[in-house]
Amino acid sequence: MNPDNTIAVITETIPIGMQFDKVYLTTFNMWREILSNTIKTLDISSFYWSLSDEVGTNFGTVILNEIVQLPKRGVRVRVAVNKSNKPLKDVERLQMAGVEVRYIDITNILGGVLHTKFWISDNTHIYLGSANMDWRSLTQVKELGIAIFNNRNLAADLTQIFEVYWYLGVNNLPYNWKNFYPSYYNTDHPLSINVSGVPHSVFIASAPQQLCTMERTNDLTALLSCIGNASKFVYVSVMNFIPIIYSKAGKILFWPYIEDELRRSAIDRQVSVKLLISCWQRSSFIMRNFLRSIAMLKSKNIDIEVKLFIVPDADPPIPYSRVNHAKYMVTDKTAYIGTSNWTGNYFTDICGASINITPDDGLGLRQQLEDIFIRDWNSKYSYELYDTSPTKRCRLLKNMKQCTNDIYCDEIQPEKELPEYSLE
């Protein structure tokens, strides 16, 4: 495969009703493009399946129907999905259509879940991003991902991660991965590709460390390296930012690695840091305190800012939707697109992956991701940490209707904390 033929495209889902001056190719259209061009094989790693539409458009149903038709065209389809305690009707339909399915019990193996979301088509084309196999991810949840076409080398490397999941569907965790599914590329030896005539260095990282086979870069290592190598700025857009590990016993442990690297970059190297964190009705109150702590560092010589991103509600409201679910970072050098929230457990016992791309000219895909971040940061959907919100969508901001003229709306009385794992 000639690496000069590689095509890479940023994709996103903009929830119905939100308005931006510039948007990129939709997740729905990209998935359809991949499905229509799949000839021999399709591998999908997924958290759960809920494509059968419940409200509004039939986008999810369209995708599900097209996947169901693939075996009839002679396409071998494999689906690795997190083992659930309740039946997944969509998955049962896939199995009836001839799709090979393995339920991956990461809870039993590591105590976490299979949270990775990616596709591999014909061992040549890939998609990786925040979107779940859920109709909401096509119309009601803000998502971001990347599709890369015509690169067998990168597809083969991502397939090695899929094979790890596929193996765990019927086997226990091996003593070590020395003889299993080695990585072809990593942070020290990235793959060189040309996208639109521009050379890019790219590699795929995986989490947690226990599932990183020989030569595979751990996702946390890739993330910290991305921050540490920045010279001018680090822009982050994630659903959750909580430097905590939640234990099975109900205890919490401080997990400072990402936060420390961000603080160090802003203070020691005067790198501009911007955090755009999602806020909705299920946001954790403890996250607000950590974000305020970071934001308080801003001063004459420390450029660090935090905003909350609120997706307006639907009418009528739709459960588990209307939130910015993206998980990416962009610096002046590198684009990082992942599948994990920035909470400790997502790097210690939950399965995730990321694509790390560095263009030689500093532009290309990295520039596109920067443009998306700045668009969202400056939009009417972004709020300061001490703002009041015109909607009840954000659990961490005071609603305007709750404020009086003589009381500054600052403190919020915390409600009972919600479970850490919900939509995410």
From Swiss-Prot:
Xref: InterPro entries: Diverse_PLD-related, PLDc_3, PLipase_D/transphosphatidylase
Q: What GO cellular-component annotations does this UniProt entry give?
A: viral envelope
UniProt-annotated location(s): Virion
Q: Which SMART domains match?
A: PLDc
Instruction: Say which domain of life the source belongs to.
Output: Viruses
Keyword annotations from UniProtKB, A to Z: Endonuclease, Hydrolase, Nuclease, Repeat, Viral envelope protein, Virion
GO molecular function, one example?
endonuclease activity
- Its induction, per UniProt? Expressed in the intermediate phase of the viral replicative cycle.
* Main location as per UniProt: virion
UniProt lists the family membership as follows: Belongs to the orthopoxvirus OPG042 family.
- Tell me the function of this protein: DNA nicking enzyme that cleaves extruded cruciform DNA at its tip. Probably nicks viral hairpins.
Question: PANTHER family annotated for this entry?
Answer: 5'-3' EXONUCLEASE PLD3 (PTHR10185:SF16), PHOSPHOLIPASE D - RELATED (PTHR10185)
Q: What is the protein name given in its UniProt record?
A: Virion nicking-joining enzyme
